[in-house]
Amino acid sequence: MVLSAADKTNVKAAWSKVGGHAGEFGAEALERMFLGFPTTKTYFPHFDLSHGSAQVKAHGKKVGDALTLAVGHLDDLPGALSNLSDLHAHKLRVDPVNFKLLSHCLLSTLAVHLPNDFTPAVHASLDKFLSSVSTVLTSKYR
């Protein structure tokens, strides 16, 4: 999915509001995903998936860091996320549908924490961005 100039502006502006909370929001989105879509827990059998666990927080930080990297490379998502794509496709073998589920949970988390900034236009831009990230992360499955 191609991000327009307006989408890129919206994504960068929204992510700037996330600031140093990317890891916290990533962890919250993971918790939402585990609660709303329990089958996603199968990829984390070695994790303590309870609320506030150190392992979920650590993985949430990885998610937040990856999204921060992606926001910084909106014009080259495939290059920026190539290593993560390899990891998820070849080593972890995550079912691609799970990226969509996590994206949904990330949007919900951002809407809760950024209510004044989460306009319909920003929502649409973030949705396109997360869809683009998901597409890149699943590109090496083929």
Curated annotation (Swiss-Prot):
GO terms for biological process: hydrogen peroxide catabolic process. InterPro entries: Globin, Globin-like_sf, Globin/Proto, Hemoglobin_a-typ, Hemoglobin_oxygen_transport, Hemoglobin_pi. GO terms for molecular function: haptoglobin binding; heme binding; iron ion binding; organic acid binding; oxygen binding; oxygen carrier activity; peroxidase activity. The modification Phosphothreonine is found at T9, T109, T135, T138. O2 binds at H59. Red blood cells. The modification N6-acetyllysine is found at K17. The modification N6-succinyllysine is found at K8, K12, K17, K41. The keyword Cell cycle does not apply. Gene3D superfamilies: Globins (1.10.490.10). It holds the Pfam family Globin. Heme b binds at H88. It comes from the Eukaryota. The modification Phosphoserine is found at S4, S50, S103, S125, S132, S139. CDD domains: Hb-alpha-like. The keyword Iron applies. Keywords: Acetylation, Heme, Iron, Metal-binding, Oxygen transport, Phosphoprotein, Transport. GO terms for cellular component: blood microparticle; haptoglobin-hemoglobin complex; hemoglobin complex. Residues 2-142 form the Globin domain. Belongs to the globin family. Involved in oxygen transport from the lung to the various peripheral tissues. Heterotetramer of two alpha chains and two beta chains. This is Hemoglobin subunit alpha.
